[in-house]
Amino acid sequence: MGRIGSVGVFCGSKTGTDPDWARAADRLGQLLAEAGIRLVYGGGRIGLMGVVAQAALRSGGKVSGVIPDFLMKLEVADTGITDLVVVDSMHERKRRMFELADGFVILPGGLGTLDDGAHELVVRRTFATYD
């Protein structure tokens, strides 16, 4: 297996009730940037998505976001990231993220995060868990 160049992160559009979740997202963004690994995520500037993206940028990393047009119109996109891909639907967002990322990390989130993570497990059939 070659070097990992990009990692997708599925996580919540809210920070949640446990401050440790935001700390973990921040640390993940920092570690990815320090390792020279591009972050691929849902393109939002809010919630854990925003935390991980801003941490990667702050640490000198490259960040690619993929966001559906309807969320762009709601002004939740982070337009200050390295590159932002606008797609037509949530389904297309997931497809593009799978194309752009070599692997995925799943952080806390809601039903969308659960759906994305389950799809990843089914498609790639490989996973590891860390505590």
Can you describe what each PLM-predicted range is?
Residues G50-A55, D116-F127:
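Short Gly/Thr/Asp-enriched flexible loops that form oxyanion-binding sites at enzyme active sites
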Residues I67, L107, L121-D131:
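Short, acidic/small-residue loops that bind anionic groups at enzyme active sites
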Residues T17-D20, L111-A118:
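Glycine/threonine-rich flexible loop motifs
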Residues F104:
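Hydrophobic acceptor-binding patch used for acceptor engagement in glycosyltransferases
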Residues M1-L100:
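A cross-family phosphate/adenosyl-ligand binding-site feature
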